[in-house]
Amino acid sequence: MVDLEQLGQQAQQASYTLGLLSTAQKNQVLTAMATALTSHQDEILAANAQDLENPQVPVKFVDRLRLTADRIQDMAIGLKQVVSLPDPIGNVDRAWRNEAGLMIAKERVPLGVIGMIFEARPNVTVDASALCFKTGNAVILRGGKEALHSNQALVQVLRGALRAEAVDENAIQLITDTSHATAAKFMQLTDYVDVLIPRGSARLIQTVLAKATVPVIETGAGNCHVYVDKDAQLQMATDIVINGKVQRPSVCNATEKLLIHREVAADYLPSMIQALREQGVEVRGDAATQAIVPDVVPATDADWGTEYNDLIIAVKVVDSEAAAITHINRYNTQHSEAIVTDNYQAGKLFQQRVNAACVYINASTRFTDGFEFGFGAEIGISTQKLHARGPMGLAELTSYKYVIDGNGQIRH
């Protein structure tokens, strides 16, 4: 079994030194990491091939797991983009002088040691390492067993870049024991880990929430909806739904449910469902949908709360916008929701009343992404309200402290 106490101690010690690095020093290391990824591409791809050869890898994980030369190049580009982003560490959010003459400033600081728990996504290894390093945080990575060889190769490359730049390589560490027992112990490493960020399925996230004693930032399972209002441009709605469902069905910002106002359902659903089927999507529908398109798969109650991560969508006809909002707030995961409408008031009501991190008018749910929001690479998409919500970039990986300058004041 991996010595988690030792990993934690090493990460904590590394975090102390990271906090002292200048922005220029951090950017130099990140640039070295980008160069190392491309120069070690063959080793990374060979390790990834070992993971892909495992017959136990679920089919729906293969796209997430697969690395190619282009994807490694994208990782390197992502690292360089993090270099170009402003460093939040040391920024002063607010400063003022109090009545006693003390100068008080609220200053951005690293969180410390961040624990990442994720599944078959090797890109998370690089994204998380880059964002944590830029913000002066050490990171301990615990990926899924499906991606173990890929993660080991990537971490070896990143740690090599740290060593080459004379930075403590324990700023980035990987837990190679993928057993549930070790994961459970990691979730309770409160002496060393300041926050856990799980990325993966709803089951993984719920397991972390149930077992962790380390504080958790809950990231998104994505049971995302598109509601087509009675005042929608229907071709626009079709384009948005197809993009949200088909472009990358395995990701958390993919569209999983389609709600349609009853006034346009009869005219619109046949063409919408045909367009989905042409893209290989299995369509499940409620009774009203079945009445319009009889050969859809009947939807069950379980469908409304399910994140498929696959080419499957469930369709429901609703009587009003209010009914759509009620349904969404009951079944969603507070990730990303969209309305298609030309009615300004309807759109704004939807944005006001839907409980989600990201609420769209006339746009695909697929835009919930750190790069698309201009944050650079994201470490995850938070679906909770405390500390961070939505795509988590650099700023969300910081805390703050108050620094107070005086000249001998005592309190009376």
Swiss-Prot record:
It holds the Pfam family Aldedh. It catalyses: L-glutamate 5-semialdehyde + phosphate + NADP(+) = L-glutamyl 5-phosphate + NADPH + H(+). Transmembrane segments: none annotated. It is an enzyme of class 1 (oxidoreductase). GO terms for cellular component: cytoplasm. Pathway: Amino-acid biosynthesis; L-proline biosynthesis; L-glutamate 5-semialdehyde from L-glutamate: step 2/2. Keywords: Amino-acid biosynthesis, Cytoplasm, NADP, Oxidoreductase, Proline biosynthesis. Its main location: cytoplasm. One of its GO terms (molecular function) is NADP binding. It is found in: Cytoplasm. GO terms for biological process: L-proline biosynthetic process. Its EC number is 1.2.1.41. Catalyzes the NADPH-dependent reduction of L-glutamate 5-phosphate into L-glutamate 5-semialdehyde and phosphate. The product spontaneously undergoes cyclization to form 1-pyrroline-5-carboxylate. Belongs to the gamma-glutamyl phosphate reductase family. This is Gamma-glutamyl phosphate reductase. It comes from Lactiplantibacillus plantarum (strain ATCC BAA-793 / NCIMB 8826 / WCFS1) (Lactobacillus plantarum). The gene is proA.
